Amino acid sequence: MGFGFGPNDGSPDFEALLKQFSEMGVDANTLAGAKSFLENMQSPNEQNLITVAAIREIAKQIITAKGDLPVGQSDQQKLSESLKIANTWLDAEILFPASNLPTQSACSKRDWLDNTISSWQNLFEPLALGMADALSNVISSTSGALPVEFMGSENNSPQQQEMMKAMFARLLRGFMGSLIATQLGQGIGLLANSITGANDVAIPLQNGAEVANLIPQNIAQWSEGLGIDPEQVSIYLSLREAAAARLFANNNWLSKYIQDVITAYGKGISIDVDSITRQAEEAMANGEIDINNPNAINIALNSGLFTPQQTPAQELALTKLEMALALIEGWIDHVISEVASDRMPAFNALIENSRRRRATNSPMQQIFATLLALEVSPRKMREASAFWSQVKQLRGADGRDKCWEDAAFLPMPDDLRDVKAFLESVTVPDDLSGLL
């Protein structure tokens, strides 16, 4: 029996279709999300492809499996002292003031998840829309009926055929949104188990309320085996957290800029069916897909095997995103080096540990690699840090930080080779009143 229209009333048999996808090895969370999308697609309210509830549920499962300790009063006091020291040091180096928003100095993994989940959804919804639109376009542009395996019968009327194509396209939209929500939720859950603070991911996620907030449980895990005084570890991580919080709180455009480049990437997504067919045939011939493995399709999708070829506009978007992420990390590394390298005996060991973890075991990198095929290389981050150091030498600390007023004042990859020429090519404003 096929899996398209029901035998009695000609309505689409989506339960059978979802069962077929399950038998092909598609992840259970992905199928559940697609089913939920179908059940709600008649709702009068606009529905996001990626829902906060779906992301949160998957991330919570991963957090719970690892354990989430409550934050005690002693944790708050110790980390509050570390942040005070960090902010005192940073006051003398960077232009951006610390936030005056009331906040605690420490939070749990679950607190961080709840505070950032809506930003994650906003950030990657445009990507889901782009991929879903591309899939829908493939179905709607198909001439004639879908294969009989999808229709359940060769005798459907033209109206039924068109209805099935439209409904199948809706199913694929839900499927794609759920797939991305599953991957994103898993990545966020892994992040929650590893980041040391609310801003450790080095992108603004606190909805305009960027404050320094550390995660004691993960700090203890981060410092295991280092053999370094815990107080130095806390101050070092507080410096990173406080510097990032100041950068994000005083440059609100950064959040929209990152979202805009992801949106630009998503809008450029298109699907070349012939190319995907070719990739599948080559993958099976090379043994990359085992047709006897029921999880083959899930493995192929999650590994990015059928990633569409990027357009020039998408390549530009990824270049901008990579540079923004590298410049943020590079600036943080640079400014904390300026204030702490001579004050903390273990500073060099601590910053090297940070860089090594980013390069070899970064859940944030994995999220971007899985969803956008983007990896920010450690070399690019080192180059970005060196860029900020040279800008300070040429323009001073204030001139360095004024570069963050607008994306127009940030370099592209080629600009890193000649910092002086880049600075001469842009006009950095003297008035920062619009930032503060």
Can you name each region flagged by the protein language model?
Residues 219-239:
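Short pre-active-site segment immediately N-terminal to the catalytic Zn-binding motif
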Residues 303-436:
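Pan-zinc metallopeptidase signature
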Residues 178-199, 248-301, 316-343:
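Post-HExxH zinc-binding segment in Zn-dependent metallohydrolases
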Residues 232-250, 388:
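Active-site recognition of the HExxH zinc-binding catalytic motif
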Residues 1-134, 382, 386-389, 394-436:
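N-terminal low-structure segments adjacent to metalloprotease catalytic domains
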